[in-house]
Structures are given as C-alpha cells and as structure tokens.
C-alpha cells in the first residue's frame, strides 16, 4: 500500500523543510516539495511534523530485578514505544546466574518473539 503525506514539515539531520513524503509498504520512496501519484492514499500532513522512527537503545522489559519484575513486558512496552514514535528498542538481555550468554540471549528472544510490536535487538 502506498501512502502520500502531503504538505508536512520533514525533520531530518539537515533541519526542517516543507515537503511531501511517499511511503510504499514499509519504505520511504521519495521526499520532495511536490509529489503527484495516482495510486496512493493521501494524508494531509499540513501543520504536522514528519520524522523518522526513533530508537530507544536502553530498555528493560520483563526483567527480574531486586525481587520484582519491571512493569512492562515486550507487548506493553513496545506498544507504548510505538505510541511515542519509537520504532526500534534495544533491550538489556541479562542471563540468570549460572546461564551461558547464549542461553540468556535465547531466553530474551523467547520473551520478545511474537509479542514485541516494534523492531528490537539486544
């Protein structure tokens, strides 16, 4: 599905500018002052900021610490991240005492697989 965001303010590492953004599936295909296509859903982005997805490189989902477990697991934490514009998280994978790093990482993958709503890494 193609979506064309019209008249938004694009925010990038080079500053801000008024532009249209054409997205095809999960990829940004074009950013330009004026884009015209016939086969895209049009979204009026006037007065809105168009920014890339953010990366949170320090999360702790479903982590047992100090006799308690963190409030968010991968399902709730990733949905909250997406609502705030974060599209990728990097979680702290901590093996249990006596576990190998490989086994600890496998456990974290099991906690996230099928539950995490955004991209993730460890």
Q: What is the role of each PLM region?
A:
Residues 2, 15, 83, 114-117:
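Alpha-helix termination/capping residues and helix-transition junctions
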Residues 45-115:
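Metal-associated gating/positioning segment near the N- to mid-region
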Residues 38-39, 70, 116, 122:
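Glycine-rich, flexible loop/turn motifs
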Residues 91, 121-122:
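Short catalytic-loop micro-motif centered on adjacent basic/acidic residues
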Residues 1-4, 9-53:
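Histidine-rich, glycine-flanked metal-binding segment
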């Amino acid at each position: 599905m193609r979506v064309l965001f019209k008249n938004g303010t694009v925010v990038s590492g080079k500053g801000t500018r008024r532009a249209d953004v054409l997205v095809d599936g999960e990829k940004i295909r074009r950013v330009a002052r004026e884009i015209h296509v016939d086969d895209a859903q049009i979204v009026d982005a006037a007065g809105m900021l168009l920014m890339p997805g953010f990366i949170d490189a320090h999360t702790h989902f479903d982590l047992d610490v100090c006799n308690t477990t963190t409030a968010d697991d991968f399902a709730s934490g990733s949905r909250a991240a997406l609502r705030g514009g974060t599209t990728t998280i990097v979680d702290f994978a901590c093996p249990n005492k006596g576990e190998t790093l490989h086994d600890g990482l496998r456990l974290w993958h099991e906690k996230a697989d099928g539950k995490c709503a955004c991209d993730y890494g460890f």
